[in-house]
Curated annotation (Swiss-Prot):
Gene3D superfamilies hit by this protein: 3.30.70.240, Elongation factor 4, C-terminal domain, Elongation Factor G (Translational Gtpase), domain 3, P-loop containing nucleotide triphosphate hydrolases, Translation factors
A GO cellular component entry from the record: plasma membrane
HAMAP family to which the protein is assigned, alphabetical: LepA
SUPFAM superfamilies, per database record: EF-G C-terminal domain-like (SSF54980), P-loop containing nucleoside triphosphate hydrolases (SSF52540)
Keyword Protein biosynthesis assigned: yes
Gene Ontology molecular function terms on file: GTP binding; GTPase activity; ribosome binding; translation elongation factor activity
Catalytic activity: GTP + H2O = GDP + phosphate + H(+)
Binding-site residues, GTP: D23, H24, G25, K26, S27, T28, N140, K141, I142, D143
Protein name: Elongation factor 4
Location(s) in or outside the cell: Cell membrane
InterPro entries linked: EF-4, EFG_III/V, EFG_V-like, EFTu-like_2, G_TR_CS, LepA_C_sf, LepA_CTD, LepA_IV
Length: 607
């Protein structure tokens, strides 16, 4: 293509993504858009086409982002090239959203006509506004009996401040309004700016590993043109590669001769090492490099840490390979090796939140067939010592001796909870129980309220979301952002089994709730640990002080069975002999802790 053809083509490109709260119909809308633009034959079409992971289809959520190129003939008779970049809606996957938005010029904001705006919708809209995107509101599910599109339209204007007078009323399920949406994209979303003659700049917004072709980078070309055979350089690492193929997704991978300004597609260059293509990095030509990389988006810091251990310790290296492969297209995952006396060799992993952790665990168990044990999740604490030093603790077993600690600070988040009026009391109760501080309360309309609380992250990590959902019959939605560290009265609680500390069961807890927490855990472990031949005391301790204790009674044989009638001294002798044996057993015996026990410490219900 010459310069004029490229410029003409560029003016016909529209890059957009779809943002929405979970379950507001984003993936269904994406399916309809694919159908409308004839991206697939009827035979290939299946529901939630872009959610290609089994896990995504099962849970009905989008986890990974996906990109597709579509051709659309608009009413003005011109052919347009649309790039749809699908994004997840769940709070843990916000970084996936920020990645896709960085590659777009426009965003379709899908709002459920019955439920209205939810917490995640807002969070994603603000991300889109930060990236200067053109936002097109779409009110979806208007065919529901409970739909009230006019109220929702008003809400979009009041709460977000967008002009919703031209919002499309649609039903992705019934296929209503799809054409209007496509026309609005063509009219309102700006064409990509950039120059195909400038030095090459491509932003990597995702990548995956193919055993035959090496690493495949998903890219958005911002300036310049990239062809097969070009020598390219990664600007963050400085490594150079020769491009072996470029192409686009029409959901299937389709090879092309070149990708130019505004294109969203993939690039393979027989890159063997996963670490060479960091998401957010800029690709440029080795011979004529760009002056500076694109403003990549920031690296996300994990908020929640836990240990992952293979049940079969021989599979330690397989687990490392699995984590390395997942890290490639999950830029928020971090891991480092660690060992535990109870569990052997494993990894300390950092995640964005609990859902992120759960999904990663499930992906490892499914895709790599490795059975895992996970330890209780913890957050990063700052510990200030009496000698003036300070340290960072992300693993309870690294907590220093209580006598040497001056103060401990923990991360706090600002949580915005949107909830129907009837459940305000229930939500306030949960937040207070989680050591939350009330900040603000705003009415969105007659029926819904936004509550703002400051809550320690460690309280959210456990089961905050589950409690919120179950106490509001699933109506509450919730979004949080980190606001910094504050001092708290925190202590480390250890669990001793048969007077031996089990390091994987240690956790950090607030002093006020330590006694109750210890009691519950001790009782729970008593139910879950099988009885042994000797009695096993379970103790919860803080420093040297035992705060709760329970005992698993020993199983014992009836040694008096053979002794008919007989003298009491004879029976006494047999019983004492048994006692001696049990005592000896207790001093050498070790106790196996089942996986359920670790999980029980996790899913602590305070009620």
């Amino acid at each position: 293509m010459n310069k004029e053809e490229r410029a003409k083509r560029q003016s016909k490109i529209r890059n957009f993504s779809i943002i929405a709260h979970i379950d507001h119909g984003k993936s269904t809308l994406a399916d309809r858009i694919l159908e409308k633009t004839n991206a697939l034959t009827q035979r290939e079409m299946k529901a939630q086409l872009l959610d290609s992971m089994d896990l995504e289809r099962e849970r009905g959520i989008t986890i990974k982002l996906n990109a597709v190129q579509l051709n659309y003939k608009a009413k003005d008779g011109e052919e347009y090239i649309l790039h749809l970049i699908d994004t997840p809606g769940h709070v843990d996957f916000t970084y996936e959203v920020s990645r896709s938005l960085a590659a777009c010029e426009g965003a379709i904001l899908v709002v459920d006509a019955a439920q209205g705006i939810e917490a995640q919708t807002l969070a994603n809209v603000y991300l889109a506004l930060d990236n200067n995107l053109e936002i097109l509101p779409v009110i979806n599910k208007i065919d529901l009996p409970s739909a009230d599109p006019e109220r929702v339209r008003q809400e979009v204007e009041d709460v977000i401040g967008l002009d919703a007078s031209e919002a499309v009323l649609a039903s992705a399920k019934a296929g209503i309004g799809i054409e209007e949406i496509l026309e609005q994209i063509v009219e309102k979303v700006p064409a990509p700016t950039g120059d195909s003659e400038e030095p090459l700049q491509c932003m990597i917004f995702d990548s995956l590993y193919d055993p035959y072709r090496g690493v495949i980078a998903y890219i958005r070309v911002v300036n310049g043109t990239v062809k097969v055979g070009d020598k390219v350089r990664m600007m963050a690492t400085g490594k150079e590669f020769e491009v072996t193929e470029v192409g686009v997704f029409t959901p299937k991978t389709t090879q092309r001769d070149e990708l130019t300004v505004g294109d969203v597609g993939f690039l393979a260059a027989s890159i063997k090492n996963v670490g060479d293509t960091r998401v957010g990095d800029t690709i440029t030509h080795a011979k004529r490099p760009a002056a500076e990389p694109l403003a990549g988006y920031r690296k996300l810091n994990p908020m929640v840490f836990c240990g992952l251990y293979p049940i079969d310790s021989a599979r330690y290296n397989d687990l490392r390979d699995a984590l390395e492969k997942l890290e490639l297209n999950d830029s928020a995952l971090e891991f480092e090796p660690e060992t535990s006396q109870a569990l052997g060799f494993g990894f300390r992993c950092g995640f964005l939140g609990l859902l992120h952790m759960e999904i990663l665990q499930e992906r490892i168990e499914r895709e790599f067939k490795i059975d895992l044990i996970t330890t209780a999740p913890s957050v990063i604490y700052k510990v200030f010592l009496t000698n003036g030093e300070d340290m960072i603790v992300d693993n309870p077993s690294n907590m220093p001796d209580p006598q040497t600690i001056d103060r401990v600070e923990e991360p706090f988040v600002k949580a915005a909870i949107m909830v129907p009026n009837d459940y305000v009391g229930a939500v306030m109760e949960i937040c207070q129980g989680k050591r939350g501080t009330f900040i603000d309360m705003q009415y969105l309309d007659e029926t819904r309220v936004t509550l703002t609380y400051e809550i320690p992250l460690s309280e959210i990590v456990y089961d905050f979301f589950d409690q919120l959902k179950s106490n509001t019959k699933g109506y509450a939605s919730f979004d949080y952002e980190l606001i910094g560290y504050k001092p708290s009265k925190l202590v480390k609680m250890d669990i001793l089994l048969n007077s031996e500390q089990v390091d994987a069961l240690s956790f950090i807890v607030h002093r006020d709730s330590a006694y109750d927490r210890g009691k519950v855990i001790v009782e729970k472990l008593k139910e879950l640990i099988p009885r042994q031949q000797f009695e096993v005391p379970i103790q919860a301790t803080i420093g040297n002080k035992v705060v709760a204790r329970s005992t698993i009674k020993a199983m014992r044989k009836n040694v008096l069975a053979k002794c008919y009638g007989g003298d009491i001294s004879r029976k006494r002798k047999l019983l004492d002999k048994q006692k001696e044996g049990k005592k000896r057993m207790k001093s050498v015996g070790s106790v196996e802790v089942p996986q359920e026990a670790f999980m029980a410490v996790l899913k602590m219900d305070d009620n």
